[in-house]
């Protein structure tokens, strides 16, 4: 269990934000035999191994230096004598990364991998599709110093790229499908998911920021795609990757040991989750939690306690990457008045009800189903990219309710509350307690 301990003896509403955070990996909690038993180091899409350290500008692996090397290699086909560093490229099409699947049989679950290609292969394959590769089309993702490699992403509109790969069985697959198909116990899979999420967010941002918001002129990439700049000489506005902050909160009725869960009309049947909403300009995180809870359910919130955060690059394409900021919020009033324009329903649920929703949802079964779907897509058997996230009991009976899977921060907020003693979440010794062990 990943526990976040805040070293303070009291909880004034604002002071917890400045407390030191210590990672304690010693505690584990098992929900039931039906749930997965594993420890997560980070949320899905966090923990990108390419983002841990950005080299200094003088380093050959830095964005600036790597980009200069890239420009010398683009006009020619690199060969084995290419100087360090080498380059790998991850192609995307319509927000979907290139992947391949391996290892699936009657007894084992297939495993998906990112479909990295060499710079030389990328150029040749794109040329065969009538697409010219240039330095402005590539976005810097980061280096792996131990492998002497720098990683890039490129956005393609041509599905013909895949057919040129021949027998390699690669395909562009929706990131949401890969998210569900990732084995949460496999650090490699979580690392690749984080890399793909970061790449998609950057590429989508480039797609929606092609024109200057100040003067309307075209923008062009700078610093290996890490920012953009207006092409108008009198404007020259700098534009940086967009991140949309969202508060997501589990509202708790401390006196009656209940949690408030809600449904939106777009949810699959029987799924319940936390309240969430975008932060408005000039608003603190705590104020956003209280406002969103009041607007959507009519419930007043008092104390607000931070849990953890998660990048979320699988939202609408108009928002390339949301940052989900998770909180526990403690209710001052209990009467629910649902805003039907925002929610389909909201209800208080007892700890036991929520625990059952965690226990009966076969998250591992969903992961295996999604992994098999990725394999079928890569083989060309399955063409649909849609994926049901509904879960059933092993007996085939429908569970009365379930919550989002371990790939979502909502799962960990809810599971952290379920597995704590009633007073622990708001104890004077710790807050923001855990990414649950599943």
Swiss-Prot record:
A motif (Microbody targeting signal) lies at residues 422-424. Its EC number is 3.6.1.-, 3.6.1.22. Pfam families: NUDIX, NUDIX-like, Zn_ribbon_NUD. Expressed in roots, leaves, stems and inflorescences. SUPFAM superfamilies: Nudix (SSF55811). Residues 241-371 form the Nudix hydrolase domain. Disruption phenotype: No visible phenotype under normal growth conditions. Gene3D superfamilies: 3.90.79.20, Nucleoside Triphosphate Pyrophosphohydrolase (3.90.79.10). The keyword Chloroplast applies. It catalyses: a 5'-end NAD(+)-phospho-ribonucleoside in mRNA + H2O = a 5'-end phospho-adenosine-phospho-ribonucleoside in mRNA + beta-nicotinamide D-ribonucleotide + 2 H(+); NAD(+) + H2O = beta-nicotinamide D-ribonucleotide + AMP + 2 H(+); NADH + H2O = reduced beta-nicotinamide D-ribonucleotide + AMP + 2 H(+). Zn(2+) binds at residues 212, 215, 230, 235. It is found in: Plastid, Chloroplast. Residues 1-36 form a transit peptide. This is Nudix hydrolase 19, chloroplastic. It comes from Arabidopsis thaliana (Mouse-ear cress). The gene is NUDT19.
């Amino acid at each position: 269990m990943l526990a976040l301990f805040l070293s303070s003896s009291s909880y004034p509403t604002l002071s917890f934000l400045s407390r030191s955070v210590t990672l304690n990996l010693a505690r584990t909690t098992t929900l039931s035999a039906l749930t997965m038993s594993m420890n997560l180091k980070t949320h899905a899409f966090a923990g990108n191994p390419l983002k841990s350290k950005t080299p200094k500008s003088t380093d050959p692996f830095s964005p600036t230096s790597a980009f200069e090397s890239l420009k010398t290699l683009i006009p020619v086909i690199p060969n084995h004598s290419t100087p360090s560093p080498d380059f790998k490229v991850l192609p995307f099409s319509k927000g979907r990364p290139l992947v391949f699947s391996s290892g699936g049989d009657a007894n084992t679950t297939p495993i998906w991998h990112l479909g990295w290609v060499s710079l030389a292969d990328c150029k040749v394959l794109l040329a065969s599709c009538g697409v010219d590769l240039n330095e402005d089309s590539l976005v810097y993702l980061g280096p792996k110093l131990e492998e002497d490699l720098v990683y890039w992403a490129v956005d393609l509109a041509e599905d013909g790229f895949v057919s040129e790969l021949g027998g390699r069985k690669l395909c562009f697959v929706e990131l949401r499908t890969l998210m569900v198909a990732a084995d949460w116990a496999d650090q490699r899979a979580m690392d690749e998911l984080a890399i793909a999420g970061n790449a998609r967010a950057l590429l989508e941002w480039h797609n929606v920021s092609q024109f200057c918001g100040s003067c309307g002129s075209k923008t062009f990439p700078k610093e290996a795609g890490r920012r953009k700049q207006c092409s108008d000489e009198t404007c020259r506005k700098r534009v940086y990757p967009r991140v949309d902050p969202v508060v997501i909160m589990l509202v708790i009725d401390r006196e009656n040991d209940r949690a408030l869960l809600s449904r939106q009309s777009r949810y699959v049947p029987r799924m319940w989750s936390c309240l969430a909403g975008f932060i408005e300009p000039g608003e603190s995180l705590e104020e956003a939690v209280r406002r969103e809870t009041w607007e959507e359910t009519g419930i007043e919130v008092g104390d607000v306690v931070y849990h953890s955060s998660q990048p979320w690059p699988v939202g609408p394409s108009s928002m390339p990457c949301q940052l989900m900021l998770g909180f526990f919020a403690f209710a001052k009033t209990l009467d629910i008045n649902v805003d039907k324009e925002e929610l389909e329903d909201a209800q208080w649920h007892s700890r036991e009800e929520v625990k059952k929703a965690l226990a009966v949802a076969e998250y591992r079964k969903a992961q295996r189903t999604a992994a098999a779907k990725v394999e079928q897509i890569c083989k060309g058997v399955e063409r649909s990219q849609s994926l049901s996230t509904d879960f059933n009991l092993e007996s085939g009976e429908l569970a009365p309710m379930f919550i989002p899977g371990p790939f979502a921060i909502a799962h960990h907020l809810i599971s952290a509350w379920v597995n704590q003693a009633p007073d622990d979440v708001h104890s004077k010794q710790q807050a923001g307690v855990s990414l649950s062990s599943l």
